[in-house]
UniProtKB/Swiss-Prot annotation:
The gene is pepT. The keyword Metal-binding applies. It holds the Pfam family Peptidase_M20. Gene3D superfamilies: 3.30.70.360, Zn peptidases. This is Peptidase T. NCBIfam families: peptidase-T (TIGR01882), PRK05469.1 (NF003976), PRK13381.1 (NF009920). Belongs to the peptidase M20B family. Keywords: Aminopeptidase, Cytoplasm, Hydrolase, Metal-binding, Metalloprotease, Protease, Zinc. It comes from the Bacteria. Its EC number is 3.4.11.4.
Amino acid sequence: MDKLLDRFFNYVSFDTQAKANVKSVPSTQGQRKLAQALQQELLTLGFSHVTLSDHGCVMATLPANVSWPVPTIGFIAHLDTSPDFSGKNVNPQIVENYRGGDIALGIGDEVLSPVMFPVLHQLLGHTLITTDGKTLLGADDKAGIAEIITAMVRLKHRNVPHGDIRIAFTPDEEVGKGAQFFNVAEFDAQWAYTVDGGGIGELEFENFNAASVAIKIVGNNVHPGSAKGVMVNALSLATRYHQELPVDETPEYTEGYDGFYHLQSIKGTVERAEMHYIVRDFNRDSFEARKKNMVDIAKRVGKGLHRDCYIEIVIDDSYYNMREQIIKHPHIIELAQQAMLDCDITPIMKPIRGGTDGAQLSFKGLPCPNIFTGGYNYHGKHEFITLEGMEKAVAVIMRISELTAKRAKES
């Protein structure tokens, strides 16, 4: 079996599901176990400067094999899988030469259907790797890890000219902490690419501005038979609050460059209620306006309440649109575009309706757009990837590395 797939299957065997609302990084021990395994693998493969931080970030260097000065570049992927779906006991299925139609996911009624996922129509003849319907696959982002390491090994064995290349594998990307303890100075690259995208050709340097919003509503509970003028129902206030938000500006009604408000959870009693939202927008001004709107709604709904009853709102910015930083370094995008074209791939430039480690790293001084892995339908049982997509990602990583050295020689 191809070594690329061997690596991928090994990595997905580790349960690295991240946990939200955990103070420690990494948030789960499985991530640390995978990090330790990668550290040993990189040492065995002969990489230099292999390190594993206290927070589970693995770094290593593939030393230059050319005599002229070349900018140090980097490639980054993340160890963890989504907290939204189990990543324990992943059992990948290989579907060779896909001929169309439904693909049974394990034993049972679960299928991967082109009716629900029309992209399958474009993948006839490809080798698909799917789940067994019980877990996610973990292509997000263990495919990225496998692709980066495989690309580095091939660069070395085929003696393709390249400068120093830094690689890193980070924890807790899925819960927004991947870059929190990433040491940019230690990584010491002029720019990098996260390998954390989707289908073949994806090249992304725009992402949401993102914030989390926690709302606490304190009411007053008395017997409903004698409640008139006294009871303040926190749940009623919560529903009033939510109804003040625009109905069509939610994830299920938005796409492309549209922003949204998303109610993730609501719980409570008459006495007390809690709501958790996320706010997303590509435009910084619109992003700030959305946050202000949420504060204004809290003031309106809470107006006139008894002094012991109130609405408290806490807004935390998570990350910003890396476009602000990337456009200062247009050659980084142009280089990736050219590498894809050289690999017979049409670059697909589109905004990330989410975030990556690269977003935070770009604001820490490491410009870091995102390139594809070849995977689809992340964060659930319908996740899959194509072997052809993985091989293309490896080829692009290698070509970016080669082009960087080639252009440095010519300049």
